[in-house]
Amino acid sequence: ELVFVNDGSKDHTWEKILELKEERAHIKGVCFSRNFGKEGAVFAGIAQAEGDCIAVMDCDLQHPPETLIKMYRLWEDGYQVIEGVKASRGRESFIHKMFAKTFYSIISDATGIDMSRASDFKLMDRQAAEEFLKLPERNVFFRALSSWVGFKTTYVEFDVQEREAGESK
């Protein structure tokens, strides 16, 4: 099953998702009326997913799909949350890297969770996903909250790939 979330995109993303849904029964789509942000899109995708495990990844292919195989095998070994951690930040500007380092240092100090190489690229067991969805918070930081829920966790390094299309908003 694949769940695609269109977070208010102004290009033809939703039309493409609808085409894919017509061609393949295992594809689902969620379309937001406007851009609600990445966290809302992640919540919506997890809520729609029905599998025994759920992977969250960016559709711009900066999260390498081939890493999902390693994540899945770790899930089969009994891990409930498999965190994708950045081996490198890819080709970001110096100023972007500096601000990111400062931001994640503050978040790490506040939460007690090492966020220095964290990403939204994860695979979660159904149980972990259900507990995540039960949390009352709706203004969340998925990258940190998924580590906080307290399930058996491991990490997989990946190299951030060049963006295939689009840009961060």
What are these regions (language model features)?
Residues 135, 149-160:
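Structured inter-helical modules in multipass membrane proteins
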Residues 19, 26-34, 38-48, 53, ...:
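Acceptor/aglycone-binding surface of glycosyltransferases and processive sugar-polymer synthases
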Residues 23-26, 152:
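Glycine-centered tight turns that cap/initiate beta-strands
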Residues 60-61, 160:
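Short glycine-rich anion-binding loops that position phosphate/pyrophosphate groups of nucleotides
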Residues 6-15, 61-62:
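A conserved acidic beta->alpha catalytic loop
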Residues 1-9, 30-31:
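Short beta-strand/loop segment that forms part of the nucleotide-sugar
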